[in-house]
Amino acid sequence: MDSIQIVGGKKLKGTIPISGAKNAALPLMIAALLTEETVTLDNIPHLADVELLIRILNNHGVGYAVDGQKSHHDCIDSRTIHFTAQKITTTYAPYELVRKMRASFWVIGPLLARCHEAYVSLPGGCAIGTRPVNFILEGLKTLGARIAIENGYVHAKAPKGLKGAHYHFPKVTVGGTHVMLMAAATANGTTLLENAACEPEVTNLIQALNAMGAKITGEGTSTLTIEGVKKLHGARISVIADRIEAGTYAMVVAMTGGNVLLKNANPHHLTQVLEVLQKTGLDIEIKPQGLHLKRNPRQTKIMPVNIKTGPYPAFPTDLQAQFMALMTRAQGTACITETIFENRFMHVQELTRLGAQIKLDGQTATVYGREHLQGAPVMATDLRASVSLVIAALAAKGESVINRVYHLDRGFERLEEKLARCGAIIQRITV
């Protein structure tokens, strides 16, 4: 099993290319099920979750072809993948595939829209709280679907097709918004979605669906109107840059100090995160090619900042663990409140193995900053927790080994390569 070995204490200098966003790529790939024509996606990252979804789509009869492009300057591949769902061969999504990644459940929307039936296993993915699919199922019911849960599977039917409806999400849900957009795109009539997610990844999907012939208005807001069309066609769409990856590397630079350009990072998708990081002492300059980050540890200490996670444009829950790692070396005390998922502090126990001082009280963590952390062997519990341990280890004295890094491979493309090119002492090892 692979592990990541890190010797901390090195400042970073260089350029880190930001990959395409996993959270945008997955729904765009699933949207290819909606048309028999070819959907071409540019800037697809090399990630375990992407490869798994390719297998799932292939299970439904989706053909694909990959164009690989390599930048000699960045030494990171970017890919274009052509997906063609000329004929859906099955509406059955088995447990052995869906259990590995929660987003794979989203195929229920396009399958129901195009084939009027779907038989999909209840999902898996990172073990963060319950993350119920109730909002998705209730939304599909409003579009006229009949839903039954049998032996761990959702059996959805709409023999006469889906019909436009009005649905108010009880709670903001990115996955639920993705599914309802795809299901309603070809429904008979107009659908109004209220309290919808307005994340950049949702906007990316709306733009893709509109490029395929859908009629969706309201992008970037919580109220979306979908005028159903009879048929969608092929299109070419580029996956947006990964704001979570960009935010993560920004926190790495804030933690270790250094001088780094985050190439292709979109500052408009990180407004609140960048405001918070500036308060911690990170110097941020927006340039045409991305974000230029600097911190001199001798001149600027890490300052504590309190945060509360929330739906976009608030501070993203997917950067909470990384920010907590940064605060472990702040000059004072910081409070971090998680409002999106319960049980998303599983990284705390492992951070304390590196010397962090953290107190938990319900959904709030109080972090008591320390001057130094100490390297140690640690265990990743989920995707974002794993990268928080990387951040802490990069600043810790001595050697750390992070185990179970398969979590890391689900969401970060070639992390050790990108960091090593900027001077970090980091390598993948097999133990």
Curated annotation (Swiss-Prot):
Cellular compartment(s): Cytoplasm
UniProt keyword annotation of Kinase present: no
Active site, UniProt feature: 126
Keyword set, alphabetical order: Cell cycle, Cell division, Cell shape, Cell wall biogenesis/degradation, Cytoplasm, Peptidoglycan synthesis, Pyruvate, Transferase
Family: Belongs to the EPSP synthase family. MurA subfamily.
Binding site for UDP-N-acetyl-alpha-D-glucosamine: 102, 318, 340
Family matches, as SUPFAM superfamilies: EPT/RTPC-like
Modified residues (2-(S-cysteinyl)pyruvic acid O-phosphothioketal): 126
Associated pathway: Cell wall biogenesis; peptidoglycan biosynthesis
Annotated catalysed reactions: phosphoenolpyruvate + UDP-N-acetyl-alpha-D-glucosamine = UDP-N-acetyl-3-O-(1-carboxyvinyl)-alpha-D-glucosamine + phosphate
Main location: cytoplasm
Matching Pfam families: EPSP_synthase (PF00275)
Protein name: UDP-N-acetylglucosamine 1-carboxyvinyltransferase
GO process terms (BP): cell division; cell wall organization; peptidoglycan biosynthetic process; regulation of cell shape; UDP-N-acetylgalactosamine biosynthetic process
Highest taxon, organism lineage: Bacteria
Lineage: Bacteria, Pseudomonadati, Pseudomonadota, Alphaproteobacteria, Hyphomicrobiales
HAMAP family xrefs: MurA
GO MF terms held by the record: UDP-N-acetylglucosamine 1-carboxyvinyltransferase activity
Family matches, as Gene3D superfamilies: Enolpyruvate transferase domain (3.65.10.10)
Its EC number(s): 2.5.1.7
Annotated binding of phosphoenolpyruvate, by residue: 22-23
PANTHER family found in the cross-reference section: UDP-N-ACETYLGLUCOSAMINE 1-CARBOXYVINYLTRANSFERASE (PTHR43783:SF1)
CC annotations in GO: cytoplasm
